[in-house]
């Protein structure tokens, strides 16, 4: 695994993919040109992957299909990954347990869904008021994030890899306008991760619900509000028909999904298949980030015309200040009680200070000077 992790940092996913495909093409041409003795075909290694998403789920599910297709192509069919959606395995929020138990060799989900089992898994999705996607990817691959994630997941018998980023998420769909902290009291909201802890501290009744059940829960009044992703996915799910107030984000500035691999299964693979799988996961993750950004931009451009019922809102400075204060207090409490939590928090905080200075003088300065 150590060598595999070093390779992850050494190679750029797309460059290596191109090189591997070129190498494979040359090898096939050479094999076709030269007569060879017939050799018995190797029996394919067939893995199963369980995903949180339902059949045909856009963007998230597409990333999993892309990864599996790349693995099969680059391995010449030596490794095949078959995908089971939540419709089949019926355990959308049980992916970690199934991969850990070896019921599935792989999984695709979001790390913060496991905070009830291990609070430190939250850090590897996103944290309120934390890093944006470029900063977070840099932390993962060059700032120690991968090492810390391995340390957390080792105890679960699982390797975890970045599985695709949504970018900055919207703050949620609400039935009624939220104008003050009093409006949040007793509000029932679906929101996962550490952001849920923050809102609970402010009086919100927080729950987590599987993606396939969100619309029904909102429609039946089981919840008063929910956050999901952003325009790339939310509008097609129809939340605006029930809860038209759509708030800008604060809680998930760079939500990273997650590929999980059973540790014993991965270690049993030949080295070249480990490398192929790692490259395919990395490429599929970044491709999902680009796709999510594209779809959000396209949907946002037409939101007023196509979805006139949507009312865009931003939380007041008073509410944002209270969220930040609650976030800081909860982080301090958790860090004092858990050395591992403290280690990861300090790593992210230190890296964000470095990265944010560059973000301010590069992207932020450019946008500030060029936004119309």
Report each predicted region and the residues it spans:
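N-terminal secretory/targeting leader peptides
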Residues: 26-136, 153-372
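A gly/proline- and charged-residue-enriched helix-loop-helix capping module
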Residues: 132-150
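Hydrophobic alpha-helical segments, principally membrane-spanning helices and signal/leader peptides
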Residues: 10-13, 118, 142, 247
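Glycine-centered signal
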Residues: 2-5, 23-25, 33
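Bacterial N-terminal signal peptides that target proteins for export
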Residues: 2-14
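Bacterial N-terminal signal peptides
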Residues: 15-22
């Amino acid at each position: 695994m150590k060598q595999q992790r070093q390779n992850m940092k050494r190679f750029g996913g797309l460059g290596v993919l191109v090189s591997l495909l070129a190498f494979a093409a040359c090898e096939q041409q050479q094999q076709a040109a030269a007569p060879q003795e017939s050799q018995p075909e190797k029996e394919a290694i067939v893995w199963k992957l369980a995903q949180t998403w339902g059949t045909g789920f856009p963007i998230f599910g597409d990333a999993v299909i892309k990864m599996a297709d790349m693995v099969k192509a680059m391995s010449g069919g030596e490794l095949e990954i078959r995908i089971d959606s939540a419709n089949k395995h019926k355990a959308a929020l049980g992916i970690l347990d199934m991969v850990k138990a070896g019921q599935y060799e792989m999984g695709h989900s979001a790390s913060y869904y496991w905070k009830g089992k291990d609070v430190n898994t939250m850090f590897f999705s996103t944290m309120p008021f934390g890093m944006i996607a470029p900063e977070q990817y840099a932390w993962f691959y060059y700032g120690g994030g991968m090492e810390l994630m391995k340390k957390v997941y080792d105890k679960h018998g699982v390797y975890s890899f970045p599985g695709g980023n949504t970018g900055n998420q919207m703050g949620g769909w609400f039935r009624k306008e939220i104008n003050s902290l009093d409006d949040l009291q007793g509000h029932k909201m679906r929101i996962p991760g550490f952001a849920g802890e923050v809102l609970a501290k402010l009086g919100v009744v927080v729950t987590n619900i599987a993606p396939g059940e969100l619309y029904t829960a909102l429609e039946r009044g089981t919840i008063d509000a929910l956050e999901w992703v952003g325009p790339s996915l939310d509008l097609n799910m129809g939340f605006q028909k029930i809860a038209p107030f759509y708030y800008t984000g604060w809680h998930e500035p760079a939500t990273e999904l997650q590929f999980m691999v059973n540790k014993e299964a991965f270690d049993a693979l030949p080295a070249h298949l480990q490398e192929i799988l790692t490259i395919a996961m990395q490429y599929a993750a970044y491709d999902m980030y680009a796709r999510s950004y594209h779809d959000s931009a396209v949907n946002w451009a037409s939101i007023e015309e196509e979805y006139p019922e949507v009312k865009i809102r931003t939380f007041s400075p008073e509410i944002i200040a209270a969220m930040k204060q609650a976030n800081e207090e909860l982080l301090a409490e958790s860090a004092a009680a858990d050395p591992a939590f403290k280690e990861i928090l300090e790593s992210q905080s230190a890296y964000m200070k470095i990265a944010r200075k560059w973000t301010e003088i590069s992207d932020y300065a450019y946008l500030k000077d060029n936004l119309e």
